[in-house]
Amino acid sequence: MLQQIYDFLNINYNVSRETFNKFKEYYSLLSKWNSTINLVSATTLQNFWQRHIFDSIQLLNYIHNKDIIVADLGSGAGFPGVVLSISGIKNVILIESDSRKAAFLLQAAQLSDQKIEIINDRIQNLKVKCDLVTVRALANLSTILSHTKQFTVKDKYLILKGKNYQHEITQALLHNKFNYTLYQSCTDDSSWILEIRI
């Protein structure tokens, strides 16, 4: 089973054996912490590779340069921010308001050879300069755009969304101007990757 997972990641995302071993360490660390603080639901932890690793790493399909600054909002258990960092994104900022989750992220960040900064604060309190914003399971699109109005985002947002994506886009367009592209998630037929440029 693990060999098949490695082969998939290696063929599709050029994941080395060393990087794959870091993902396995990530699973062990997450399992340990999840017993004391609720980072992910127990059912999704059982499906760690598809639900969390594949779901996060697929964003690399829409990132064409790893030498960038990525701001990951509401990082929680580190998806997708930590996964992208372990996969070679040079500079990742993890933003998490919950101090317990930020403590977990501090440990998870040690698995990466790249630069990771952890900011334990609310998104709306920050002025962040980055190339790309990533978001997974945080808030509706209108809230995300409102909370990041003071950000300087050079390129785009990549937001993992579920089946209500169209309603969220319609509502957000009432108060915001942006262009968007939708991509089907490779992990779930009812999930989408929303690419936004403002």
From Swiss-Prot:
InterPro entries: rRNA_ssu_MeTfrase_G, SAM-dependent_MTases_sf
Entry's Gene Ontology cellular component terms: cytosol
Pfam families per the UniProt record, alphabetical: GidB
Catalyzed chemical reaction(s): guanosine(527) in 16S rRNA + S-adenosyl-L-methionine = N(7)-methylguanosine(527) in 16S rRNA + S-adenosyl-L-homocysteine
Molecular-function GO terms, alphabetical: rRNA (guanine-N7-)-methyltransferase activity
E.C. designation(s): 2.1.1.170
Gene3D superfamilies documented for this protein: Vaccinia Virus protein VP39
Compartmental location: Cytoplasm
Alphabetically ordered keywords of this record: Cytoplasm, Methyltransferase, rRNA processing, S-adenosyl-L-methionine, Transferase
Binding site for S-adenosyl-L-methionine: G74, F79, I123, Q124, R136
Tree of life domain: Bacteria
Function according to Swiss-Prot or TrEMBL: Specifically methylates the N7 position of guanine in position 527 of 16S rRNA.
Family, similarity comment: Belongs to the methyltransferase superfamily. RNA methyltransferase RsmG family.
Protein name as it appears in the record: Ribosomal RNA small subunit methyltransferase G
Organism: Orientia tsutsugamushi (strain Boryong)
Organismal lineage: Bacteria, Pseudomonadati, Pseudomonadota, Alphaproteobacteria, Rickettsiales
